Amino acid sequence: MKIVFIGGRDIHILGGIESYMLNLATQLVKMEHEPIVFCESDHNGEEFVNGFRVIHQKGFNSNLICKPWLGLKATLKTIRHIHDADIIHYNAWPPSLWSPIARLCGIKSLMQGHGLEWQRSKYSPTQQRIMKFMEWLTAHLNRNLIMCSEDQCRYFKKHYNREATAIPTAIYL
């Protein structure tokens, strides 16, 4: 199965999503799948890491626009150049805004939620309202939802009447 991951930062600068994609893609290669990872980076280019293809896309200094823009670029590149992709795995809502385009081209997709971003105190009230709207939009645009916690699944069921599957990606200490 050819699985395209869209939505992380540079895979060499390990954060939560990046570590998750690196480890999952590495295991998928061992199971004879073909993962392809698009990541935000400080340069454009391609490389192979642990047997899977990594496509670096240069981002720019606007968090509000950068991730949706890179999600669109990665979705279009998948449609145009990765003709036999079986599924696109979007990490978080910004890149998943383009999942309807993938579906129109016959590619299945899923969106993995990594938290309720608008609740984080680091964002201004205006940013929180925009994120809340984007969450609503994501809930309605994406057909297949997975979340990192049961709490997020319950939230999406309660507020959007959307079923989501919980797949915890962290470790338990």
Tell what function each PLM region has:
Residues 51-77, 118-127:
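A short, charged, and often flexible helix/loop element on the N-terminal side
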